């Protein structure tokens, strides 16, 4: 069975293997053992309650419970930008006009922004390509909403997610090539690695301080502003169906979109509800896939089951209860995995 659980120190080797499969561009999952080890430690300290809010971050792994193999990772930062500035570009407009000459130009412009300071962030989502099947990607992404719903007071009012921008298989980023490289004088992969390993001071030191007219960028760079990497398109669609929207903020490195939503308006959080579990054989029938999660902070578990999403009493097998760290009579959180498609 596939189960989501908190990261553990013993997961380091598995995370290093995952990091080696990302192909670059996933800043928060560098193939660097020291960085990943520190990330695990920070997550454990977050659960232990020893870190200030500005440093808190939860990390979860997707595990195949029979073998203990780690096949995916996802994370939540509690509040971004409270220690180091959290940058993105806001895509706006500057108007240049002259009535006398009958000239009016509305020019798209990039403004450096820290507008999302203090927001919670969904990040570090990666699933081993060999395991991209049977709803694993949905489980990995949406399990975080179950955790946020159960422990709502630990997160802020808004949640954001930076989507991976357009980068080709060689690591070439049109946006970086046309803009970032001119200010940072390094390749995209180098800047990405420095950022991922916590060496972020160079951003504040070298960032352009004034608005950038996008017309000055290459046509290729202009075309990818707010666009996602082809492999990231499904993840964007998943979040948009949960209520996330693009409000004209993009990543400073690759131009990928930042999606955002009020936490309490996220569908899976808003519609999740508590039910009592019982042990037995689930009723037969063609039931939809649902997310189920326990309500245990330190021993959080989440998995997919097929059941009636409106049931008042959830029947699980002994094996499912064991994986969820639950007993009959316990309370669990339940929500339909995907929103129902509206029919005309």
Curated annotation (Swiss-Prot):
Domain of life: Bacteria
Gene3D superfamilies to which the protein is assigned, alphabetical: 2.40.40.20, 3.40.630.30
Active-site residues (renumbered): 229
Enzyme Commission code: 2.3.1.109
Pfam families associated with the record: AstA
Molecular-function GO terms, alphabetical: arginine N-succinyltransferase activity
Coiled-coil region list: none
Keyword Zinc: no
GO biological process, one term: arginine catabolic process to glutamate
Keyword line: Acyltransferase, Arginine metabolism, Transferase
UniProt similarity note: Belongs to the arginine N-succinyltransferase family.
PANTHER family, sorted: ARGININE N-SUCCINYLTRANSFERASE, N-SUCCINYLARGININE DIHYDROLASE
Protein name: Arginine N-succinyltransferase
Organism: Enterobacter sp. (strain 638)
Record gene name: astA
């Amino acid at each position: 069975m596939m189960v989501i659980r908190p990261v553990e120190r013993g997961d380091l080797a598995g995370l290093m293997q995952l990091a080696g499969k990302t192909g670059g561009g996933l800043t928060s999952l560098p193939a660097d053992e020291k960085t990943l080890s520190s990330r695990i430690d920070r997550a454990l300290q977050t659960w232990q309650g020893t870190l200030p809010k500005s440093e808190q971050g939860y990390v979860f792994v997707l595990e195949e419970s029979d073998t203990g193999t780690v096949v995916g990772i996802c994370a939540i930062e509690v509040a971004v930008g409270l220690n180091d500035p959290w940058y993105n570009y806001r895509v706006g407009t500057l108007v240049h006009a002259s009535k006398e000459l009958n000239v009016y130009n509305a020019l798209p412009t990039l403004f450096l922004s820290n507008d999302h300071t203090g927001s919670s962030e969904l990040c570090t989502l990666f699933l081993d390509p060999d395991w991209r099947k049977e709803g694993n990607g949905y489980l990995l992404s949406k399990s975080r909403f179950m955790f946020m719903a159960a422990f709502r007071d630990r997160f802020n009012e808004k949640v954001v997610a930076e989507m991976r921008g357009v980068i080709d298989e060689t690591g070439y980023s049109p946006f970086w090539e046309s803009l970032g490289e001119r200010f940072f004088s390094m390749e995209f992969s180098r800047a990405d690695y420095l950022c991922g390993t916590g060496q972020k001071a160079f951003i504040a030191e070298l960032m352009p301080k004034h608005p950038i007219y996008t017309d000055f960028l290459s046509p290729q760079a202009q075309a990818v502003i707010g666009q996602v990497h082809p492999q990231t398109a499904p993840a964007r669609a998943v979040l948009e169906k949960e209520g996330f929207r693009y409000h004209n903020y993009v990543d400073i490195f690759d131009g990928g979109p930042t999606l955002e939503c009020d936490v309490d308006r996220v569908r899976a959080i808003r519609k999740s509800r508590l039910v009592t579990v019982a042990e037995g054989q689930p009723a037969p029938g063609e039931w939809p896939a649902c997310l189920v999660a326990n309500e245990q902070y330190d021993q959080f578990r989440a998995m997919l089951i097929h059941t009636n999403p409106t049931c008042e009493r959830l029947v699980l097998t002994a094996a499912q209860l064991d994986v969820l760290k639950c007993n009959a009579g316990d309370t669990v959180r339940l929500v339909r995995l995907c929103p129902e498609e509206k029919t005309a």
